[in-house]
Amino acid sequence: MMRTLTPITLQEVSFAFAEPPILDRFTLHIEPGRIVALLGPSGCGKSTLLRLLAGLSVPASGEIRFGDRLVARAGWGLPPEQRDIGMVFQDYALWPHMSVAQNVAFPLRMRGVSRSERERRVSEALARV
């Protein structure tokens, strides 16, 4: 299924673990299809920004939109599996209680793909490696 690319907008987003905040009223608009690099020293908010976009954290203020769809605002966020995005972690880890095939199938299961289709896709993917 072909997906339509949508803009990503962060409007006045703030996030803090403590003082000072990691992101303070941060605003960014990314046009569909653009490639963006996040550069900066350790602790400047790059990973926090990605966690907010992925739905692994929620902002203290502001809002995040994918196109017209609100995916996060102060204290609330659409769950990661409902955001239609993917993220590859720098230091990834497999779920230790799952087999490799179960780890590969996990995002498909979260998307509601049928068991037979998951098994077909997992088998196809693992045959490549």
Where do the language-model regions lie?
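Conserved structural motif at the start of ABC-family nucleotide-binding domains
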Residues: 8, 23-25
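Short beta-strand immediately N-terminal to the Walker A/P-loop
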Residues: 36-37, 87
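The feature captures the beta-strand-to-loop junction immediately N-terminal to the Walker
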Residues: 39-41
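Helix-to-loop junction immediately C-terminal to a conserved catalytic motif
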Residues: 54
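ABC ATPase NBD Q-loop/coupling interface
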Residues: 63-83, 113-114
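Conserved ABC ATPase "signature" region
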Residues: 69-73, 109-129
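Short coil-to-helix segment of the ABC ATPase nucleotide-binding domain corresponding to the Q-loop/switch region
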Residues: 98-107
